């Protein structure tokens, strides 16, 4: 099958060929730390071999659970936050039509997927409860600890809604818990109540977990082919098995990013030209930001959805500070296409476009914008996708994961932890009056003048 390709021709005005050769020793060192598990955080690097070394029996249970959900539910509510949310959301959006939840049942591959537990908004939860109404639904709650605030709140709400609708015993059969194999509040409740459970592997961090049960159950329930997803990742694992930058495009992406960073390009914009890829950017931002942003180092990950954001961010990208570069994820073959309709007269000025498809307009717009941005001093990298399908997605997931793993080690940091997130949690728990935070509560409330 066709693979994704990485294109560096639009950084040639910014990066000389010899700079990649000079980066090779640093990439080789990073590769050794990754593959030999000698780098910081190596205990969380099982994702490297995950496409070939995963629990096949559990994988079959996931497929069976997805079929069960499709047989007894119209809706699956997926409860999780961060890595327990973004990977599944990204994949479900990527692999299904834009308005999948609005399609009639016979026009969808699987059930409607809605996400909860990813914010503290009461309005969001109320609105989702109203959307569900009297439709049959199931819940997939995803949390390693079972005590993360946002998912725990949402789980209470939807668990009680299930119990009210189906009764306590029948509700238990509609709850699927993805959690720690041995410990934690959710694990203990799942065992006690008899929920079907799936395991979050100890050696895979949240932002790398989309190819584990964390992502696989929601993706399968949506009707996507998760075997194709894993096959794509498996082929990428084989393709990116060498450290040589002339043979490993994931590492070449990591090297290009690091070279640009060293030249002062400290912000990366991930660009897409398809609305179904908006959450690809959100997943990527967590993957890159949590992995690299440590010790006052790292590339700041941002994103833009083109052509929409050209009408808001286009001016800044063209003429603002020259500290950013773009990585464009471009789909070479759209899932569907549309001819521009003929219309008598030329009031809208579009007659010159008649006879071509709307995707051709999208492609030419992408090419033109790239040329303009490069001319304006913005280095441009490109990741080309041959198709918008499960195989390609699995391949691309592994591409970005390998790139950031290597990139993190080139910065001399641990790419697999996220110690900085504890600061906001401490402040939030203290202000909410959580037991054990009494001293911090006094301090933070005093600072707020309470």
UniProtKB/Swiss-Prot annotation:
Pathway(s): Carbohydrate biosynthesis; gluconeogenesis; Carbohydrate degradation; glycolysis; D-glyceraldehyde 3-phosphate and glycerone phosphate from D-glucose: step 2/4
Keyword presence, Isomerase: yes
Catalytic activity: alpha-D-glucose 6-phosphate = beta-D-fructose 6-phosphate
Record's keyword annotation contains Cytoplasm: yes
Catalytic residues identified in the record: 290 (proton donor), 311, 425
Major site of localization recorded for this protein: cytoplasm
Domain of life: Bacteria
Location(s), subcellular: Cytoplasm
Pfam families: PGI
Keywords of this entry: Cytoplasm, Gluconeogenesis, Glycolysis, Isomerase
EC number: 5.3.1.9
CDD domains per record: SIS_PGI_1, SIS_PGI_2
Signal peptide per UniProt: none
GO CC term, one of those recorded: cytosol
InterPro entries: G6P_Isomerase, Phosphoglucose_isomerase_CS, SIS_dom_sf, SIS_PGI_1, SIS_PGI_2
GO molecular function: carbohydrate derivative binding; glucose-6-phosphate isomerase activity; monosaccharide binding
GO biological-process terms attached to the record: gluconeogenesis; glucose 6-phosphate metabolic process; glycolytic process
Family to which this protein belongs: Belongs to the GPI family.
The protein's role, per its UniProt record: Catalyzes the reversible isomerization of glucose-6-phosphate to fructose-6-phosphate.
Protein name: Glucose-6-phosphate isomerase
Organism whose genome encodes this protein: Leuconostoc citreum (strain KM20)
């Amino acid at each position: 099958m066709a693979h994704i390709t990485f294109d560096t021709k639009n950084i040639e005005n910014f990066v000389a060929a010899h700079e990649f050769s000079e980066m090779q020793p640093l990439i080789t060192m990073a590769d050794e730390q990754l593959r030999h598990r000698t780098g910081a955080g190596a205990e969380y690097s099982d994702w490297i071999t995950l496409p070939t070394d995963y629990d096949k029996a559990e994988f079959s249970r996931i497929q069976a659970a997805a079929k069960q959900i499709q047989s007894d539910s119209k809706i699956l509510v997926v409860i999780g936050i961060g890595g327990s949310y973004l990977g599944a959301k990204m994949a479900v959006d990527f692999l299904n039509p834009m308005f999948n939840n609005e399609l009639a049942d016979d026009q969808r591959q699987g059930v409607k997927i809605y996400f909860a537990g990813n914010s503290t908004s009461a309005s969001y939860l109320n609105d989702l409860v109203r959307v569900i109404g009297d439709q049959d639904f199931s819940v997939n709650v995803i949390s390693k600890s079972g005590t993360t605030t946002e998912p725990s709140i949402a789980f209470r709400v939807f668990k009680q809604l299930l119990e009210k609708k189906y009764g306590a015993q029948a509700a238990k059969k509609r709850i699927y818990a993805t959690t720690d194999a041995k410990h934690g509040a959710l694990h203990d409740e799942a065992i006690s109540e008899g929920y079907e459970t799936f395991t979050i592997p100890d050696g895979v961090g949240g932002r790398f977990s989309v190819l584990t049960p964390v992502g696989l159950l929601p993706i399968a329930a949506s009707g996507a082919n998760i075997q194709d997803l894993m096959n794509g990742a498996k082929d990428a694992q084989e393709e990116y098995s060498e450290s040589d930058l002339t043979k490993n495009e994931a590492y070449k992406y990591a090297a290009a990013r690091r070279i640009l960073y060293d030249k002062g390009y400290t912000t990366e914009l991930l660009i897409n030209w398809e609305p179904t890829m908006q959450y690809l950017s959100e997943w990527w931002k967590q993957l890159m930001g949590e992995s690299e942003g440590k010790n006052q180092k790292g590339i700041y990950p941002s994103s833009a959805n083109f052509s929409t954001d050209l009408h808001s961010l286009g001016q800044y990208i063209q003429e603002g500070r020259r500290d950013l570069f773009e990585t464009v994820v471009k789909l070479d073959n759209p899932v569907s296409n549309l001819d521009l309709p003929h219309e008598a007269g030329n009031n809208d000025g579009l007659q010159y476009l008649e006879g071509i498809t709307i995707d051709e307009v999208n492609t030419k717009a992408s090419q033109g914008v790239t040329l303009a941005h490069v001319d304006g001093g913005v280095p441009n990298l490109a990741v080309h996708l041959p198709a918008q399908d499960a195989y390609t997605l699995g391949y691309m997931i592994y591409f970005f994961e390998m790139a950031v793993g290597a990139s993190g080690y080139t910065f001399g940091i641990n790419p697999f932890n996220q110690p900085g997130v504890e600061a906001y949690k401490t402040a939030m728990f203290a202000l909410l009056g959580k037991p054990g935070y009494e001293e911090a509560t006094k301090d933070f409330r005093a600072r707020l003048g309470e």
